[in-house]
Amino acid sequence: KAKCAEIDQDCKTSCDCCKGACTCY
């Protein structure tokens, strides 16, 4: 799985990090 560089970013990329949780598509 890919890692997200930052938390709470825009959440419109292939790897979303929102509210402390990351979801990679």
From Swiss-Prot:
Disulphide-bridged cysteine pairs: C4-C18, C11-C22
GO cellular component, one term: extracellular region
One Pfam family per UniProt: D_CNTX
Keyword Secreted appears in the UniProt entry: yes
Predominant cellular place of this UniProt entry's protein: secreted
Highest taxon above the source species: Eukaryota
Tissue specificity of this protein: Expressed by the venom gland.
GO MF annotation list: toxin activity
Compartments where found: Secreted
Record key words, sorted: Disulfide bond, Knottin, Neurotoxin, Secreted, Toxin
Subunit structure: Monomer.
Role summary: Neurotoxin.
Free-text note on domains in this protein's UniProt record: The presence of a 'disulfide through disulfide knot' structurally defines this protein as a knottin.
Family statement: Belongs to the neurotoxin 03 (Tx2) family. 06 subfamily.
Protein name: U11-ctenitoxin-Co1b
